[in-house]
Amino acid sequence: MARYTGPVEKIERRLGVSLELKGERRLAGKSALDKRPYAPGQHGQRRTKISEYGLQLREKQKIKFYYGVLEKQFRKFFREANRQEGNTGENLIKLLERRLDNVVYRMGFASTRRFARQLVTHGHILVNGKKVNIPSYLVKEGDRIEIREKSKNNVQIQRALELSQQTGIAPWVDVDKEKLVGVFQRVPEREEVNIPVEERLVVELYSK
């Protein structure tokens, strides 16, 4: 399955929730979901009853688009979450929060996860002083994440830092905005992650 490259705001309208896919437009209240809070298409405003399977599938899609992962990656993360002790759904969210592209976003170095993924793949990010260009790389507690020296004046990065003054920085990371360096202090608790999803439905989907 190829990565989705179409209009991301259509996804939010179809799923009916904000998935933080558009940074500035979302903050300004100008996103397509704000203007048209119903599904796209001729029959978008009709209310239709969704089956149990449909609800489970929708929750899975929310998580996939929220973190920008493909089906193969998602299944890999789910299997790992299921192997771990504790609540599988919570484990899944915690694992996805450790993805390098997500941590870059949480630190305020990118206004969207899509841009954060580009920063990683294009070699702009260092982890503990070494370049890592794999978005799915799992960050560990204490890891030092920084923008490489040549990229620190990137206009989009600077703009993202300005926007982070409105959105705030995740409490589980520590960031020096002047040096463009952050430390992943701890894995967040599920209640700290404001993702509009019922992950238990995803667990039910894969338990069939």
From Swiss-Prot:
The record, for InterPro entries, names: Ribosomal_uS4 (IPR022801), Ribosomal_uS4_bac-type (IPR005709), Ribosomal_uS4_CS (IPR018079), Ribosomal_uS4_N (IPR001912), S4_RNA-bd (IPR002942), S4_RNA-bd_sf (IPR036986)
| Domain S4 RNA-binding: residue ranges | 98-160
Q: Does the keyword ATP-binding apply?
A: no
Q: Which Gene3D superfamilies match?
A: Ribosomal Protein S4 Delta 41, Chain A, domain 1, RNA-binding S4 domain
Sorted alphabetically, which Pfam families does this protein's record hold?
A: Ribosomal_S4, S4
Annotated GO biological process: ribosomal small subunit biogenesis; translation
Keywords from UniProt, A to Z, are: Ribonucleoprotein, Ribosomal protein, RNA-binding, rRNA-binding
Q: Name one GO cellular component term.
A: small ribosomal subunit
Where in the sequence is the signal peptide annotated?
A: none
In its UniProt record, a GO molecular function of this protein is:
structural constituent of ribosome
Note the subunit structure: Part of the 30S ribosomal subunit. Contacts protein S5. The interaction surface between S4 and S5 is involved in control of translational fidelity.
Report the sequence similarity comment from the record.
Belongs to the universal ribosomal protein uS4 family.
The protein's job, in short, is: One of the primary rRNA binding proteins, it binds directly to 16S rRNA where it nucleates assembly of the body of the 30S subunit.
Protein name in UniProt: Small ribosomal subunit protein uS4
Q: From which source organism is this entry?
A: Nautilia profundicola (strain ATCC BAA-1463 / DSM 18972 / AmH)
Gene assigned in the entry: rpsD
